[in-house]
Amino acid sequence: MLVLMFVYIASGLLLTAVSVPLILGRIPPNGLYGFRVRKTIEHPQIWYLVNKYAGQRLLLSSLQLIVAAVLLMYIPGLSIDVYSYAVLVVWGAGATIAIVSAFRYMNSL
């Protein structure tokens, strides 16, 4: 289970690293990286605003993944199956909220 925790932590750190350039506005509109929908691709001003917002939410959900991976590891008697599902459910909820809120923000512009 320790190996799985390190995989989750590494994944969270990778997502954190991916979110920082978005937050800092360093990623121009492109077809590979960022919050890519028609509205953001067609309007560079909206691209930077929405990607900053989405990057902040991605950062929060990646930190949520790391915290869940560490804290759930120390629940006594937790099986590896329950641990893996619990971490993914916690992160999945945060990621879903991040995506929905980014769409709502984009639609408010």
Each model region followed by its residue ranges:
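Select subsegments of transmembrane alpha-helices in polytopic membrane proteins
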Residues: 51-64
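Membrane-helix interfacial "entry" motifs
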Residues: 1, 42-54, 80, 84
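Transmembrane alpha-helix/helix-exit interface in multi-pass inner-membrane proteins
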Residues: 16-30
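Alpha-helical transmembrane segments
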Residues: 3-19, 87-93
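C-terminal structural segments of small proteins and small subunits
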Residues: 76-109
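Cytosolic, membrane-interface loops and tails of multi-pass inner-membrane proteins
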Residues: 28-48
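Helix-coil boundary and interhelical linker segments in multi-pass alpha-helical membrane proteins
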Residues: 1-7, 73-82
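Alpha-helical transmembrane segments of multipass membrane proteins
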Residues: 19, 66-74
